[in-house]
Amino acid sequence: MAGAYDDRDGVIWMDGELVNWRDAKVHILTHGLHYGSSVFEGERAYNGKIFKSREHSERLLKSGEYMDIPIPYSVDEIEAAKEEVLTASGLQDAYVRAVCWRGSGDDMGVASERNPVRMAVAAWEWGAYYGDAKFKGAKLDIAKWKRPSPETIPCFAKAAGLYMICTMSKHAAEAKGCSDAMMLDYRGYVAEATGANLFFVKDGEVHTPTPD
C-alpha cells in the first residue's frame, strides 16, 4: 500500500514549480473547496507516454472556459508540466491528475472573480480501475441519480462539482457489493459509469453514448 494520498514521497507540480508531495497544500478557505469551482483531467501514462495527452490538456482549458475559471497556462505549458512530473517521479505507467481551481483570495461568496486560479499536476501508480473485475467482469448497480440535462449544468465541462452524484452512486453500489453504478441520463438513456465510459461491440462496431 502506498499510504494516504496526503502522506507520500514524491513531488507535485503546483503553480509552476515542483514541490514536495506533503507540502502541496491549499488554504481551508479555498473557493473551490466550498463552491466546487474546480476542473480536472484524469489521464493514464503507458511506458512513459500519456494517452491522448494533448487532447486532455485542450479539454482542461475548455472546461475552464465553461466554468468561468480562466486557466493561466497554455496547452504547451500544461503538457510540459505533466512531462516534468512524470520525469521527476520516475514513473512509466501511471495515473496523471491535472486540476485547476479558484483559490483563496478576496472573495468568499459565490462570485470568485478576484480569487486566483491555481493549478497542480500529480502522478502516481494506480492499477486497474476495477481491479480483478476488469478481467472477470464488473457488476454494476443502476444509479438512483441521473445525469442532469445540459440545460441545467455545463455538462461538457469535466468539473469537480458535477461528480457529487457519481460519488453518492458509487457509495450505494459498493454497499450492494457492486463494482460501480451505471448512470442514466435525464431522458433515461445509458450515459456512463460513475468514473468511466461505457462501450459495447455490436456487429463488429464499437458503440458508446453520445456526449450530450
Tell what function each PLM region has.
Residues M1-E84, V110-D212:
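Helix-start/capping segments and mature chain N-termini
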Residues I78-D107, W124:
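Short, acidic/charged, Gly/Pro-enriched secondary-structure junctions
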